[in-house]
Every structure is written in C-alpha cells, then in structure tokens.
Amino acid sequence: MVAPGSVGSRLGAVFPFLLVLVDLQYEGAECGVNADVEKHLELGKKLLAAGQLADALSQFHAAVDGDPDNYIAYYRRATVFLAMGKSKAALPDLTKVIALKMDFTAARLQRGHLLLKQGKLDEAEDDFKKVLKSNPSEQEEKEAESQLVKADEMQRLRSQALDAFDGADYTAAITFLDKILEVCVWDAELRELRAECFIKEGEPRKAISDLKAASKLKSDNTEAFYKISTLYYQLGDHELSLSEVRECLKLDQDHKRCFAHYKQVKKLNKLIESAEELIRDGRYTDATSKYESVMKTEPSVAEYTVRSKERICHCFSKDEKPVEAIRICSEVLQMEPDNVNALKDRAEAYLIEEMYDEAIQDYEAAQEHNENDQQIREGLEKAQRLLKQSQKRDYYKILGVKRNAKKQEIIKAYRKLALQWHPDNFQNEEEKKKAEKKFIDIAAAKEVLSDPEMRKKFDDGEDPLDAESQQGGGGNPFHRSWNSWQGFNPFSSGGPFRFKFHFN
C-alpha cells in the first residue's frame, strides 16, 4: 500500500495543477444532485489522498455513472489515471471536463501538458492560448506562457529534424529529435523517425529501444513490431525476433510481411534449438550438420554464418577433431578476432595437436577479454604445464600416437615398438644399451597411457613416473631398470613374461 501523502507529493512534482481538485468543493451538492454521487466523490478524494489509487478510481467510476454531467467526477478520475501513469485514459476525461465547464483553466492547462508530451503541438498551443484568454490565476498564466514558448520551440526543432532527415543528415536529425523527445516523450511518430535515423547510422539496438516505446504508445502498431523483429533477426537474436513477430501476428494474423518473416524465423529457430540439444547430448557430428543447415537456410545474414561456424568449431574441438576445429575456429577469428569462444575451442584443439605455444597464445588472448573465466585460467595453466612437460619425456611421442589415441591404438603401438627395440635384438653392446633405454621408455609409456588415472595426470601436465612432479617427494615408485623389465611380455595384458625372444 502506498503511504498517505506520497501520491500528493508525486502529483505535486509531475502534475501540479491537478492538486487543485483536492480543494474543489462538490458544487452539485448545493443543487440537490444525487447524494450517492457526492458520497462517491468524497470517499474517492480521501482514498486518493491516502494513495489507494485503485479504490479511488472505483469511486470516481461510480460517480461518473451516477452523474454523467458532473465535471468534478471526470476531473478527479483523470487525476487518478495520471497518478497511475495512464495518460491516454486521462485525456478523454479532461476533454469532457472542458466541454462541461469551458472556463475550467486547470483542466485545459493540464490537457495542454498532455498534448505537448504526445507531440500534438498545434492542439497544445491552442489550449495554452485559451488559458491565457480566460482570466487565469497568476500561476496559471505564468505556466501557460512558459509552455507556449516551449511548444513553439518544439515546432521549430521538429521542422529542423524533418529537413535534416530529408537531406539524409541523420546525425543532425538525431540531435534535433533528442531535444524534442525530452519534452514530447509520448510522441510515437518522432520515436519511429529517430529509430529510422539510428538504423541508417548503423545503431540497430538504439532503434529497437525507440521502436519498443512506439509500440506501446501507438495502439495496434504492427509496423513497429515487424521492424523490431527484423532488427533482432539481423543481429542474430532469433529468439527475440520470433517473440516480436508473434506480437505482430497477435494484432493482425493476416499481416503478410509478419507472417512470411515468422515462417523464416521459426524454421531457423527450430534448427538452432535442435543443434544445441544435440551438443548437450554430446552428438557433435549431428550438431555440426544442423548448423550447416542453418547457414544454408539464412546465407544472407552474416551473423548466422559466424555463430554457426563458432558452434561447429566448438563441436570439432569437443569431438577431438583438432585439424577441422583449428580450420573453422580460425575462420571465425578472421571475422571476429576477439571471439572468446573460438579462442578457447581453438586452444583446446591446439593442445590435442601438441601445439602448446599456439594454445597458450589463444588462452592469453581469451583471458584479456574475460579474465575471470575459470575455464580459460585452467586451460592456460594446463597448456603451460604441457609445454614444460613436452620439453621432457613425452609418452605420446615415445609411442608415436596422438594425444587423443584410443587404448587399443596405444597397445598396438607399444607391441610394435617393444618388438623393434627389445634388447635381445641387438648384439653390439652400445646398441644394446641404447635399446635398453628405448625399451624402458616404451614400457613406461605403455604403463602410463594404458592406465586411465595415470594418463589423466599426464594429460593434465603431471608425469606420474617423474619423482619431481609427484607432490610430497620420497622417490619414484614407478622407476624401472632394464633388469626389472626383462621377461616382460609386450603381447600380454599383464603378468610376467614366461619366455625370452630368440632370433636367428
């Protein structure tokens, strides 16, 4: 509930001349008019003073119904409408007051205020001039003169704005319109004109703001909803575009342009929603196909091409297809060098390709634009660890497999290399020592990469067989010498090797 007196202070600031109604005595009582009407008026006045606007409005509705020719009832109802922010509803009541009582200057002055805000300058000027001719109070006279000067200034500015617009000087037109709309805040046509200027100047979001205001100020404004929808569409915001075009069709279901646009946006929206659902389910190949369809469905709006490629880049990265990911992500970054999502996804692809310097560079670039992103921070730390690790022993390189190799590929590579570098194959002492070292590295690589837990540690930049990288120290529990690997069967999934190789 609004505190008593708050409505009075609000009206005093915004509609000072309406406060006169609180002191107006109901003249109809002296003429023997319906006592019920008087009761509604008095109760409504008390409720209005207490800030109970809805209840006050009900009382004034009843008073108008009881006495349709009572100007006080209309005036007080107009006051409530204005206090509720319903200027459209207040205007007819003020007009009725003036029709019933021509010399009621407070009502005419207030109507002039409303007409000025609506941009109806000729009508506003007419009201202010009539106030000055009707023997007004000193305060009313001063206010009418001030508003008349303001209305005249708005006429001049509007003429300049229209001339600038016709001359394609949209920057100047916007400057003039800015000044007018500070006063004529409810002028839908001027907001639509400024929106056109913003569109010409390449500022669609400012245009949308004006058009949204115009859609509320003018009833059944299908044109505004259509333009808002198309602007959102051009910006790549298909969901808001769909929402706005639906508002147009609610007003006119047969609107040809809105219906045609609706079908296009709905089709595109369905494809994108389907693609995102596939990504959530980890079905990256299918999602890629959907986004390729998006680009075919809307080839003329660059935003959808960029966004689609950005998501395809993400799919390739998550699906561990680094070559494709790097190619598509790079295309996105050529169009949008600061695209954080593309930078992150390309960095992940670089990690798979063991291009650590490039990954670090991408993560650092992404961090410049989003320094609080935990994923970027963790990715950068991982890339730095892997770079450091690559300068030491790299188990993937030892086995000659990619970082995203499956366990089966790892075992196959291990068996091949274990046979190739088994020390029994070498008779020369120097070659045998070299083979022993190679064989130990090959066996160590197999041990780490075939164990999910150990492999994860290594992938995160920590060598589980390196004592220096093990927290807590205390030596390397996985250290092996050649002797400990003798008798090891590279073709066994575990257990001791039961025989030695013999070569002719």
Swiss-Prot record:
TPR repeats lie at residues 37-70, 72-104, 105-138, 154-187, 188-221, 222-255, 268-301, 306-339, 340-373. Residues 375-393 are annotated as: Flexible linker. It is found in: Endoplasmic reticulum. Keywords: Chaperone, Disulfide bond, Endoplasmic reticulum, Phosphoprotein, Repeat, Repressor, Signal, Stress response, TPR repeat, Translation regulation, Unfolded protein response. One of its GO terms (biological process) is cellular response to cold. It comes from the Eukaryota. Widely expressed, with high level in the liver. Induction: Up-regulated during an endoplasmic reticulum stress. The modification Phosphoserine is found at S274. Disulfide bonds join C248-C258, C313-C329. It holds the Pfam family TPR_19. GO terms for cellular component: cytoplasm; cytosol; endoplasmic reticulum; endoplasmic reticulum lumen. Residues 1-31 form the signal peptide. One of its GO terms (molecular function) is protein kinase inhibitor activity. Residues 394-462 form the J domain. Residues 451-481 are annotated as: Disordered. Interacts with EIF2AK4/GCN2; this interaction occurs under endoplasmic reticulum (ER) stress, hypothermic and amino acid starving stress conditions and inhibits EIF2AK4/GCN2 kinase activity. Interacts with EIF2AK3. Interacts with EIF2AK2. Forms a trimeric complex with DNAJB1 and HSPA8. Interacts with THAP12. Involved in the unfolded protein response (UPR) during endoplasmic reticulum (ER) stress. Acts as a negative regulator of the EIF2AK4/GCN2 kinase activity by preventing the phosphorylation of eIF-2-alpha at 'Ser-52' and hence attenuating general protein synthesis under ER stress, hypothermic and amino acid starving stress conditions. Co-chaperone of HSPA8/HSC70, it stimulates its ATPase activity. May inhibit both the autophosphorylation of EIF2AK2/PKR and the ability of EIF2AK2 to catalyze phosphorylation of the EIF2A. May inhibit EIF2AK3/PERK activity. The J domain mediates interaction with HSPA8. This is DnaJ homolog subfamily C member 3. It comes from Mus musculus.
